[in-house]
């Protein structure tokens, strides 16, 4: 057998045997395995033959990848400048501009090298993170069930498939109940197909119902999915981030093009300038105006941010999900496990018994029999844990068949034989589902609902238990009449940090809505305990097939937008809630864990698979949590906003620099016919690139509200700040070249109306002035308040100091004839630093003015909150948090907007007294709104004239 085995497996490898269609016994024979699975040694040997169970990744050439960083619109402009330097500049009696050509190529290589190294590091980090999300499979090895990476599966392995699993390899099903399999990803079939014992299932399809064991028949590239993947290449969609990047790049390129056209028209036909100096001036605009490092800075910032998120317990599967997370303003959160601990307890004293001759202990035993003893969920563990010995759940009986939980039936069931050989069946699950089974439903329905409501008022979930005899003795038979025997109360305590996290979320402008499958009263009680509000609706009344007539005339979208949560939610309702919130222009996040949550997770702007989610939910999500609880999501929101803030800061900076270089040097060239050496612009660009890379690790204050790309804000701020810097350079040039101001005030050597040779010193002075103030601009764009108040990252400061020290040394000492500059000495260097410092201060005021003009709120930062004029730490933080909370509750219709209460008050003392009373009333109202059931609902009632309490009471599930 040992000699024959490799040959047989070789036949399987070459697909000479049709394992998909031959009888199942022959499958075992051909794969040389049994239903007891493989040994670890045999599996290792087969791994060497068949390879890993994953698709071959196309390895890109590292050289081509490196050169790829030089192939984008921004690099094309630089490459055009390099060609200009040796082709077009070769005239006017002068040789080609080799130093500029070499400088441009050096800049491109430096930029590509940084991009290559950073992206390689980010790629390695991303690969390590994605490895944590690698699909797992339950496999029988050495006679024991183990959880292994799906990548190590081999033909002949016995695997277990259950609800929510993505099937890890092509397999044939063994004995058991039929499965419902969703093959839409492979075949396009919209409805799940039923697969029974002996049928084949494909890798990549999803188990929608049932549980069964299967034998693996093909892995990796030999699977149906693997062969299909070889035929088609995945298409890369252009994401929103890429569109923004393109828009900013195009703006910079167009600005340069406009500047060059104006220069060409004025210099040659009007001023009749010499050919070669004109080309040099055009090169200055081309080289200095292009933000060559922009793609690198932004992608590296996102990659580093993604790694930071992973450390916090949120793994991003799609990089651009970070920008969506930063803009998220509504989060629909599961209750169980996210807002609560998902650690259930049962109070035996509260158990209600509905059958004669049955006591509370018997109800617990029957519920335990309808539970798993292995691979338990939270409910199974809580119920089996109530027994003195967990083995009692199967003591004295023989298990015939177990029906696992699924979202449709919402119950589990066990068919078993007792010691006398009689067959029985016991089921536990959602009370409504169990009640529907009962033969005497009409007799007990009122009492059952009364008990459920009594439990719900105390925040307790209910679990129904029913029992039947199966006289036919077959597991397939319907059995005798079901007897409803009892209701168990389940308590799932809220997480200790949930209430505080919800308060933080509201202060950050994120409205948290509870989405729960539990009944309305439980949702309201949990909402009350967490301080998130009790303005909740039964989702079936709003979104179900049979919407209630009394609220059908009401604006459903508006009710959904203003609701604090939804109860009795089915997976299809989640999808509808997300869709309607998006229609109201909200950036919506949705948490989920089950296979049926996948459509809602895909539809949401940010699909969040919670800790312990099924493979299907993880596959559909954008972010996968590795820790439980809402606090992970809110931390991820803050981190995402910080990442987004860094990217936004850089884009404003990049646009500003383009405008300042193009406008500043164009005016110098056209007004005073000053030819700035292109090589020195290259030096500025190289030093800038080195410094600006550190922005990806800068210390920033996240936006206090959801943020998104606002191109109008970026371009307006960039144009105004860039225009200001350009004018400062023009004024400096005029003062140094046309007046005696600096020599008179500071005692430095004069540059006034100097000879042409001394343009070299003027070039050095302009170089230093442009270099310092251009790079210092990053400190203005990175801060929301005064730039000298918000402490920047250590790396950014060090990089700035080193770069400007180098720039100062070049300006002071360099006598480079090839670059047409001459050292200006320490006196002029000091003058330039002072000049830049004086004209740096108005940059913050201009920033506030732009923000005020765009939003009308910027002066709040300076005057109302006074954060710029105090040395106190966190001055006014509490008041600001309350203001944000107030603004958000007003936005979502949860309190009446501000009105001018004191318009008629004329007496100053009276006004003060009124103000104090109003403050006290406002604080009482705020606390009441946060902590009482009535406070949350009354504003909606007032605004809409709706009797919301009546609506809610009429639809208690």
From Swiss-Prot:
Molecular function (GO) terms for this protein are:
ATP binding; ATP hydrolysis activity; metal ion binding; P-type proton-exporting transporter activity
Cite the ranges annotated as topological domain Extracellular. 87-98, 270-279, 671-675, 736-760, 815-823
Write out the transmembrane intervals: 67-86, 99-119, 249-269, 280-301, 649-670, 676-698, 715-735, 761-781, 794-814, 824-844
Catalytic residues, chain numbering: 334
So which tissues is this one expressed in? Expressed in roots, stems, leaves from both vegetative and flowering plants, and flowers at early and late stages of development with highest expression levels found in flowers and stem.
The residue ranges for the Cytoplasmic side of the membrane come to 1-66, 120-248, 302-648, 699-714, 782-793, 845-957
Gene3D superfamilies tied to this protein: 6.10.140.890, Calcium-transporting ATPase, cytoplasmic domain N, Calcium-transporting ATPase, cytoplasmic transduction domain A, Calcium-transporting ATPase, transmembrane domain, HAD superfamily/HAD-like
* Leading EC class: translocase
InterPro entries cross-referenced by the UniProt entry: ATPase_P-typ_cation-transptr_N (IPR004014), ATPase_P-typ_cyto_dom_N (IPR023299), ATPase_P-typ_P_site (IPR018303), ATPase_P-typ_TM_dom_sf (IPR023298), ATPase_P-typ_transduc_dom_A_sf (IPR008250), HAD-like_sf (IPR036412), HAD_sf (IPR023214), P-type_ATPase_IIIA (IPR006534)
Q: How does it sit in the membrane?
A: Multi-pass membrane protein
Q: Which GO terms describe its cellular component?
A: plasma membrane
The positions annotated for binding Mg(2+) are 593, 597
**Cellular localization per UniProt:** Cell membrane
EC number(s) for this protein? 7.1.2.1
Q: Which UniProt keywords apply?
A: ATP-binding, Cell membrane, Hydrogen ion transport, Ion transport, Magnesium, Membrane, Metal-binding, Nucleotide-binding, Phosphoprotein, Translocase, Transmembrane, Transmembrane helix, Transport
Q: Which Pfam families match?
A: Cation_ATPase_N, E1-E2_ATPase, Hydrolase
Which GO biological process categories is it annotated with?
A: proton export across plasma membrane
What is catalysed by this protein? ATP + H2O + H(+)(in) = ADP + phosphate + 2 H(+)(out)
- What does the function comment of this entry state? The plasma membrane ATPase of plants and fungi is a hydrogen ion pump. The proton gradient it generates drives the active transport of nutrients by H(+)-symport. The resulting external acidification and/or internal alkinization may mediate growth responses.
- UniProt record similarity statement: Belongs to the cation transport ATPase (P-type) (TC 3.A.3) family. Type IIIA subfamily.
Which PANTHER family does its entry note? CALCIUM-TRANSPORTING ATPASE (PTHR42861)
Q: What is this protein called?
A: Plasma membrane ATPase 1
Name of the encoding gene? PMA1
């Amino acid at each position: 057998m040992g000699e024959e085995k490799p040959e047989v497996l070789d036949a399987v490898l070459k697909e000479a045997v049709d394992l998909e269609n031959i009888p199942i016994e022959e499958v075992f024979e051909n794969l040389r395995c049994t239903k007891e699975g493989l040994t670890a040694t045999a599996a290792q040997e087969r791994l060497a033959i068949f390879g890993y169970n994953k698709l071959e990744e196309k390895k890109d050439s590292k050289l081509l990848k490196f050169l790829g960083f030089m192939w984008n619109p921004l690099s094309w402009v630089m490459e055009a400048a390099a060609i200009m330097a040796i082709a077009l500049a070769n005239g006017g009696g002068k040789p080609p501009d080799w130093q500029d050509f070499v400088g441009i190529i050096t800049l491109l290589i430096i930029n590509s090298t940084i991009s290559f190294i950073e992206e390689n590091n980010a790629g390695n980090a991303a690969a390590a993170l994605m490895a944590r999300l690698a699909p797992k499979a339950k496999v029988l090895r050495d006679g024991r069930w183990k959880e292994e990476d799906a990548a190590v599966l081999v033909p002949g392995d016995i695997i277990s498939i259950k609800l929510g699993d993505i099937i890890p390899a092509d397999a044939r099903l063994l004995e058991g109940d039929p499965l419902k399999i969703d093959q839409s990803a492979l075949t396009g079939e919209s409805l799940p197909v039923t697969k029974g014992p002996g049928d084949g299932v494909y890798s990549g399809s999803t188990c929608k119902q049932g549980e069964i064991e299967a034998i693996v028949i093909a892995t990796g590239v030999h699977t149906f999915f693997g062969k299909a993947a070889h035929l088609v290449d995945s298409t890369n969609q252009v994401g929103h981030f890429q569109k923004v990047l393109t828009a900013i790049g195009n703006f910079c390129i167009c600005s340069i093009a406009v500047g060059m056209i104006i220069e060409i028209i004025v210099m040659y036909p009007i001023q009749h300038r010499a050919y070669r100096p004109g080309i040099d001036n055009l090169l200055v605009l081309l080289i200095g105006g292009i933000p060559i490092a922009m793609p690198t800075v932004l992608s590296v910032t996102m990659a580093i941010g993604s790694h930071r998120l992973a450390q916090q317990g949120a793994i991003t599967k799609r990089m651009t999900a970070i920008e969506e997370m930063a803009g998220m303003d509504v989060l629909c959160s599961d209750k169980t496990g996210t807002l609560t601990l998902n650690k259930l307890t049962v109070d035996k004293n509260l158990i209600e018994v509905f059958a004669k001759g049955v006591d509370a202990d018997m109800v617990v035993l029957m519920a335990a029999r309808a539970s798993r003893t292995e691979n338990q969920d939270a409910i199974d563990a809580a119920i089996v844990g109530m027994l003195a010995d967990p083995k009692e759940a199967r003591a004295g009986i023989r298990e015939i068949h177990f029906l696992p939980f699924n979202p449709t039936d919402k119950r589990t069931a066990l068919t078993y034989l007792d010691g006398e050989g009689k067959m029985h069946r016991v089921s536990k699950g959602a009370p409504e589902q169990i009640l529907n089974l009962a033969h005497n439903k009409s007799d007990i329905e009122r009492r059952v609902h009364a008990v459920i409501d009594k439990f719900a008022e105390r925040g307790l979930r209910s679990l129904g238990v029913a029992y039947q005899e199966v006289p036919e003795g077959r597991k397939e038979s319907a059995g005798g009449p079901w007897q409803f025997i009892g209701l168990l109360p389940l308590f799932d305590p809220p997480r200790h940090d949930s209430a505080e996290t919800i308060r933080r979320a509201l202060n950050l402008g994120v409205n948290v809505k509870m989405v729960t499958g539990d009944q309305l009263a439980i949702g309201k009680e949990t909402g009350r305990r967490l301080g998130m509000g009790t303005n909740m609706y039964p989702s079936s009344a709003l979104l179900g097939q049979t919407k209630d007539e009394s609220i059908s005339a009401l604006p459903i979208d508006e009710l959904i937008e203003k609701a604090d949560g939804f109860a009795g939610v089915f997976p299809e309702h989640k999808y509808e809630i997300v869709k309607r919130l998006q229609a109201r222009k909200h950036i919506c996040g949705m948490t989920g864990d089950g296979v049926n949550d996948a459509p809602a997770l895909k539809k949401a702007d940010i699909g969040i698979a919670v800790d312990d989610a099924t493979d299907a939910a993880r596959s559909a999500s954008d972010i996968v949590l590795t820790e439980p609880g809402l606090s992970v999501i809110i931390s991820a929101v803050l981190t995402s906003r910080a990442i987004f803030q860094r990217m936004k800061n850089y884009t404003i900076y990049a646009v500003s620099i383009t405008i300042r270089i193009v406008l500043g040097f164009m005016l110098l060239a056209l007004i005073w016919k000053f030819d700035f050496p292109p090589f020195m612009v290259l030096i500025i660009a190289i030093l800038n690139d080195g410094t600006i890379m550190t922005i990806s690790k800068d210390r920033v204050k996240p936006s206090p509200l959801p943020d998104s790309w606002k191109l109008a804000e970026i371009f307006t701020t960039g144009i105004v700040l860039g225009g200001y810097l350009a004018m400062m350079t023009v004024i400096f040039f005029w003062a140094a070249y046309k007046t005696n101001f600096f020599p008179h005030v500071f005692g430095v050597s004069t540059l006034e109306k100097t000879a042409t040779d001394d343009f070299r010193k003027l070039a050095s002075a302009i170089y230093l002035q442009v270099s310092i103030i251009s790079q210092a601009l990053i400190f203005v764009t990175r801060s929301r308040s005064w730039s000298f108040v918000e402490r920047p990252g250590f790396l950014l400061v060090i990089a700035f100091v080193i770069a400007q020290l180098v720039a100062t040394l070049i300006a002071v000492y360099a006598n480079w004839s090839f670059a047409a500059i001459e050292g200006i000495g320490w006196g002029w260097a000091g003058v330039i630093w002072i000049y830049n410092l004086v004209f740096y201060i108005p940059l913050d005021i201009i920033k506030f003015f732009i923000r005020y003009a765009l939003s009308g709120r910027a002066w709040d930062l300076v005057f109302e909150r006074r954060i710029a004029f105090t040395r106190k730490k966190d001055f006014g933080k509490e008041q600001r948090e309350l203001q944000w909370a107030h603004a958000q509750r007003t936005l979502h219709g949860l309190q009446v907007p501000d009105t001018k209460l004191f318009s008629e008050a004329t007496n100053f003392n009276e006004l003060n007294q009124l103000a104090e009373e109003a403050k006290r009333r406002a604080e009482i109202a705020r606390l009441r709104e946060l902590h009482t059931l009535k406070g949350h609902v009354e504003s909606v009632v007032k605004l809409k004239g709706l009797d919301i309490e009546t609506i809610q009471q009429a639809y208690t599930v």
